[in-house]
Amino acid sequence: MKKLLLTLLAALLLFSGCAAQKQESQPQQTAAEQTAELEPSAAPQWEELRFDTSLPLSYATQFSVRYAEGGYTDITIGSDQEFLLVAQDAAVPENVPSSITILRQPLSHIYLVASAAMDYFDRLDAVDRIALSGLKASDWYIESAKAAMEDGSMVYAGKYSAPDYETILEAGCDLAIENTMIYHTPEVIEQLQTVGVPVLVERSSYESDPLGRIEWLKLYAALVGKEAQATADFESCLASLSGILDHPSTGKTVSFFYINNSGAVNVRKSGDYIAKAIRLAGGEYLSFDESGEENALSTMTIQMESFYSAAADADVLIYNSTIDGELQSIDELLAKSPLLADFKAVKSGNVWCITKNFYQQSLALGDMLLDVHAVLTDEKTPDAELRFLRRLS
């Protein structure tokens, strides 16, 4: 692989050094390059573009989308990413700042490493835009993604820290969508960009409001030109949640946790989106911090004694099986810590396990809210009426 990269980089340097020389055999030009040569006046100046229309957002704060006439979309993510999405029949503007990454529609050979984003593409009927996956077929819980890999229309191209550059280049990748784990291996970003693959680092995990995470559907819709569908879907989601968002708190306390291999307990901080989702659903989240920190890493690990002291009288326990594996019974939970037998929720049969496929289904957060509200308002809610929660007995 290193040999391939060195060869490719050497070729790029050789090309740049010889750009002034005319050669008998020239590489085939893209349609955009041919248009630019035939109609140089068709390309507007960057300074002339007026992004005077925006995609309405109600809860999301980590991205924005603006539009200019002529087929130009400006997308910003966080404070350090900006993209110019150019329509297929539009010319790339002149003098675009180097800090802005240019994307050309249609984006149809995406390398998706941020697995949580697949659910957005699935909802938009746009899984066919993804040619390369950062997960193997056996690791997908989203059926459309699994099916695409099984029929060969989507192929495995390596995980975030070890992409298969040869496969990526052969596929003609036009965008890599990464999660923030990529910042641990910045050399991968540099290498992808060097070989001509734009990189977008998605930040939905930095949305502190659960509804903001759901609204990221609109960001992916902008990439594939389906904003109207995304807006309608988001409004439908809000409508389905209106009954619980306006519902007063039940006053019931909820603890969301898992037990690691050393016997310590991992819990969400009070500012985490899961904690906020529980509050939106009508519960009182049991927190173990006072910071109200709101970021993607808002979890903490505490000793079982501390967890026992604060959560023994919790009305509801929800075990996070997306990290530790899905539990099948109370006995399996008690095997992790016999102390849990003293907990009020264990004695009353109000212990639930979140299913392991939840973490891949970003849009399912709305259903999760409905599930939590159901178990808070009716302790006899049957599993069949829930999507992601299953009672442990």
Report the location of each language-model feature:
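Soluble non-cytosolic domains of exported or imported proteins
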Residues: 104, 158-163, 179-186, 207-214, ...
